[in-house]
């Protein structure tokens, strides 16, 4: 029987529910259990695909092409699992499916209501995740905080789950904040008490608390919280601010969190405890890096940390392999000119231009790529970065001064990057991209193929509607550009590289989505190797 763990939050948002859920997931996985992660987002958008990155952060893409919340990236990187369309559910998706059923007459004339129709659909999504993965444990994070109007249907649905699958198969974990008042030199438990009271008022009694705090919480305060919340004191877990993300699973294990979860759910794991030795080595390496490598990231959304979180994490993963800390210098593409690019790049060991949409900042990207190419600075382009690298090469090597992307200038004579043929007649923006995992065939004797350990074919995740215009392939190849990765039918250019440079590779796909702390993705690994000039130093 699948066990269901529901992770909720209170007091404030951004408590780290996703990291806490992922850390528990990692511990359970390392005990030999099959774990599936799931996120419920209470916004009415169908998915975050059309949302402004400044509001929502990065859009994460799964193997099956789901545009999802960035928390799925945390799940995949920390737990080391693959997520799917069943892993991210929004209010918009729920209402869309319910209304579609109503239009088809599936409800046979019944009045469609939040209870039972919306809550039943939410429960169906939870159950479907279990059925399609055959998991031992489903960990579902409920977005927002308890008491939010938007989250109410989700809270009601998970309350009902306890009755439907049996109380021995459901556990509620509530994450709260225990603030420290510096003026009074004391920690306050009242916000946690009120948050749990709010949760209990809707019929959910938490079985475990995760307390976010600046510093360790005194035992007497834990006893007080236990008294007011009816949560046994041994199931009150601390989540103390830590210098490294990798500390949290180890801190949870030290407090016996995974064992307490297994005991509560009567869950027998194949291993008596989580084997975290490799994780400890990773944590030790991450805290004691001996070198530093500076990478300039030129992008459109650099003011928001979360906008490129998978990219910056992937850079760090590669850094661990080379025992080097990656210092990421983020630069707004719009601010770059021919006059200041030398100053911007003077201390950089490498340049990365990640994905994005729209016309803003494109000329700044092109200027930075030109500088990297001409000065042989290692360069990695991703999605839009690959497209702008192609435009830069056309302008400054082929001499096609009006070369551009059809996205930036549909009327240009030399549209090096054109909209994909099957996307030309699309009127909607959302859900109309080339999304998900697709294969690419790698050319022998290239740096790209070497980066992927001489594999013939790789599978990578995509999110784009524009592609390299094949009419220019021959001219590019004659000028020295190599198409080192293409689709199996040779129609779509996936990867370009300039072989006589130290490292100049750009990919149409998003390699950052498949990077893991203990397994850096191939292009990132090769890029940081070239930028740092250091030998790989394996620690696992």
Swiss-Prot record:
Keyword Transcription regulation applies: no
Subunit comment: Homotetramer.
Catalysis: reaction(s): UTP + L-glutamine + ATP + H2O = CTP + L-glutamate + ADP + phosphate + 2 H(+); L-glutamine + H2O = L-glutamate + NH4(+); UTP + NH4(+) + ATP = CTP + ADP + phosphate + 2 H(+)
A single MF term (Gene Ontology): glutaminase activity
GO cellular component: cytosol
Alphabetically ordered keywords of this record: ATP-binding, Glutamine amidotransferase, Ligase, Magnesium, Metal-binding, Nucleotide-binding, Pyrimidine biosynthesis
Other observations noted: CTPSs have evolved a hybrid strategy for distinguishing between UTP and CTP. The overlapping regions of the product feedback inhibitory and substrate sites recognize a common feature in both compounds, the triphosphate moiety. To differentiate isosteric substrate and product pyrimidine rings, an additional pocket far from the expected kinase/ligase catalytic site, specifically recognizes the cytosine and ribose portions of the product inhibitor.
PROSITE patterns hit by this protein: GATASE_TYPE_1
Binding site for CTP: 13, 148-150, 188-193, 224
Residues involved in Mg(2+) binding: 71, 141
Summary of activators and inhibitors of this protein: Allosterically activated by GTP, when glutamine is the substrate; GTP has no effect on the reaction when ammonia is the substrate. The allosteric effector GTP functions by stabilizing the protein conformation that binds the tetrahedral intermediate(s) formed during glutamine hydrolysis. Inhibited by the product CTP, via allosteric rather than competitive inhibition.
Superkingdom of origin organism: Bacteria
Residues given in the record as L-glutamine binding sites: 54, 356, 384-387, 407, 465
The encoding gene: pyrG
Residues of the active site: 383 (nucleophile), 510, 512
Glutamine amidotransferase type-1 domain span: 294-537
Protein EC: 6.3.4.2
Annotated pathway: Pyrimidine metabolism; CTP biosynthesis via de novo pathway; CTP from UDP: step 2/2
CDD domains: CTPS_N, GATase1_CTP_Synthase
Main function: Catalyzes the ATP-dependent amination of UTP to CTP with either L-glutamine or ammonia as the source of nitrogen. Regulates intracellular CTP levels through interactions with the four ribonucleotide triphosphates.
Name of the protein in its database record: CTP synthase
Amino acids binding ATP: 14-19, 71
GO biological process terms, semicolon-separated: 'de novo' CTP biosynthetic process; pyrimidine nucleobase biosynthetic process
Family from the record: Belongs to the CTP synthase family.
Binding site for UTP: 13, 188-193, 224
Source organism (scientific name): Lactobacillus johnsonii (strain CNCM I-12250 / La1 / NCC 533)
Region of interest: Amidoligase domain: 1-267
